[in-house]
């Protein structure tokens, strides 16, 4: 289905159930969590919930709203996915996903560890309120790295493509999605009386225990410990990345009238960044458990540059001077990052591409512009490790291939709008990628759940599946429709290398970082279609 020219979803739609290569070299796999599937099925924990389609906020009609391609509907539904992955206390009056309820309500009270989860690191007597935030994927861990990347990407899209959000009537949904994440980041940030960072929680949940279950989070009773980085157990990547998330969000909220909240976010962002820069180290060396899920392959210099670039903008948006932060970002980029690997892209682990685009926008630096354009040209032309399928998908990695394409699409849109768009190549890359994801591909199938034709029926997602291990491989559609979720997509540079099966966590899992660039790119496409 697609959205009509008046920009309003019909009730039938709403309630149907139906050039040069430089270091660092990217890792082969930067994967979301690998689920542990027992050989023998176990008894499901939860009863099968009813099939209920959540209502979608109608898109306002009028000037600029008539994009006949369905970008608005796809954007609406993307926010429903974020709501389906919320943890914490869900307000019954505003919860649009009726098969989701309160969960993770003991987060922060099942033990807080500074560093690895062992007896020596347990902080006796420390109890925190870590409710809220987002589950990272189709399971129930809460991880700082993908959350930080997700929030900064969503905020960036709201800043860069505000007219797209206005045209589709989704600005309020964007602000709500970002705030659900930033409220949690504020809880995860431990400070002293002077506002200096003392610790930052980088993971909540016993992920191995969670992976042994196939059940909705509402029914789970396993312990959910919290692991934090400190000065002695540093995590510059996760803290600088979270500073970037808070700084970018502060700009978004300031632009939309929430001045006091924006000021609070900026204060926390600056404190986290000072901590990240002073106590340097990879968080995955301090909390080794995350190495199996979200290892810091790229190190922390990329997040330090990215965080400083966002802080420069945030300080200026608040009426201050961002010069020192911008010089810091430039120094880190030029000296420590050195350039961009053209066959890779922005993702939860590698923020160097985002840093480069921000600095190219804000400084016009010729070398950085050359880096960005060399990278984007590789994606346009299919060179330097970027493969192009017969249907036009740019492919670099089997695990969540569409996430990488969508992330590049969003940054291509940002760069096209703000710096240069040679012969329209970058904006065409962005819109073509989104059109491919939404169904303009050789499979004639949408990769966004609940949107368009032949969309995924069995995304790898515990709560949406509505079954336990006994039904895990039943081949039936999920009981609950996970509206708006972007699945991983083709696992090879082949348009048909995709199977809609629940057990395929490489091609059919979903994740909050998968949808982040996708959401921004949708807003870009909607903005272009609306004439802005």
For the regions a language model picked out, list residue spans one by one.
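Long, low-complexity, Gly/Thr
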Residues: 1-65
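Aromatic (Trp/Tyr) and acidic
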Residues: 59-153, 157, 202-241, 245, ...
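Long, compositionally biased, intrinsically disordered segments
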Residues: 77, 81, 168-169, 184
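A non-catalytic, amphipathic alpha-helix used as a structural packing/dimerization or gating element
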Residues: 77, 180, 264, 268-271, ...
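Short coil/linker segments at helix-helix boundaries
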Residues: 156-180, 222-230, 248-266
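Carboxylate/His-rich catalytic cores and anion/metal-binding grooves
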Residues: 177-195
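Hydrophobic, small-residue-rich alpha-helical packing segments that form membrane-like cores
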Residues: 270-274, 281
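Acidic, Ser/Thr-rich low-complexity linear motifs
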Residues: 285-296, 342-346, 388-398
């Amino acid at each position: 289905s697609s959205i009509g020219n008046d920009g309003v979803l019909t009730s039938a739609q709403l309630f149907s159930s139906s050039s040069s290569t430089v270091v660092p070299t990217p890792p082969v796999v930067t994967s979301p969590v690998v689920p542990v599937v027992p050989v023998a099925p176990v008894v499901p924990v939860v009863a099968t919930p009813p099939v209920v389609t959540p209502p979608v906020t109608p898109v306002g009609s009028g000037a600029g709203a008539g994009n006949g391609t369905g970008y608005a509907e796809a954007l609406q539904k993307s926010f429903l996915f974020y709501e389906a992955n919320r943890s914490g206390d869900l307000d019954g009056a505003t919860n649009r996903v009726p098969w989701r309820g309160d969960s993770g309500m003991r987060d922060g009270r099942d033990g807080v560890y500074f560093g690895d989860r062992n007896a020596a690191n347990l902080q006796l007597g420390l109890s925190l309120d870590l409710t809220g935030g987002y589950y990272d994927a189709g399971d129930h861990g809460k991880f700082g790295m993908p959350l930080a990347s997700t929030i900064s990407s969503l905020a960036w899209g709201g800043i860069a493509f505000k007219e797209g959000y206005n045209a589709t009537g989704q600005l309020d949904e964007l602000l709500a999605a970002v705030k659900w994440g930033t409220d949690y980041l504020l809880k995860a940030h431990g400070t002293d009386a002077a506002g200096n960072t003392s610790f930052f929680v980088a993971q909540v949940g016993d992920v191995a225990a969670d992976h042994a279950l196939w059940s909705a989070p509402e029914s789970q009773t396993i312990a959910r410990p919290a692991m934090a980085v400190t000065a002695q157990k540093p995590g510059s990547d996760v803290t600088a990345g979270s500073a970037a998330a808070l700084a970018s969000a502060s700009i978004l909220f300031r632009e939309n009238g929430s001045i006091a909240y924006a000021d609070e976010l900026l204060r926390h962002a600056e404190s986290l960044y000072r901590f990240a820069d002073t106590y340097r180290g990879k968080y995955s060396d301090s909390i080794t458990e995350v190495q199996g899920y979200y290892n810091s392959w790229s190190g922390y210099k990329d997040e330090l540059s990215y965080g400083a670039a966002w802080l420069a903008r945030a300080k200026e948006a608040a009426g201050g001077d961002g010069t020192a932060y911008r010089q810091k970002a430039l120094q880190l980029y030029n000296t420590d990052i050195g350039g961009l690997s053209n066959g890779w892209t922005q993702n939860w682990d590698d923020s160097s591409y985002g840093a480069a685009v921000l600095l190219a926008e804000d400084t016009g630096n010729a070398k950085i512009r050359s880096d960005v354009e060399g990278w984007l040209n590789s994606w346009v032309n299919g060179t330097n490790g970027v493969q192009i399928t017969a249907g036009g998908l740019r492919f670099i990695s089997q695990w969540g291939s569409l996430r990488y394409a969508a992330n590049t699409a969003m940054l291509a849109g940002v760069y096209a709008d703000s710096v240069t768009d040679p012969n329209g190549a970058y904006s065409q890359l962005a819109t073509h990628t989104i059109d491919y994801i939404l169904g303009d591909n050789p499979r004639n199938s949408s990769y966004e759940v609940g949107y368009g034709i032949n969309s995924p029926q069995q995304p790898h997602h515990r709560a949406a599946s509505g079954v336990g291990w006994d039904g895990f491989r039943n081949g039936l559609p999920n009981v609950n429709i996970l509206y708006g979720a972007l699945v991983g997509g083709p696992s090879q540079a082949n348009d048909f290398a995709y199977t809609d099966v629940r057990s395929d966590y490489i091609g059919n899992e979903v994740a909050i970082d998968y949808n982040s660039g996708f959401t921004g790119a949708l807003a870009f496409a909607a903005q272009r279609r609306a004439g802005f």
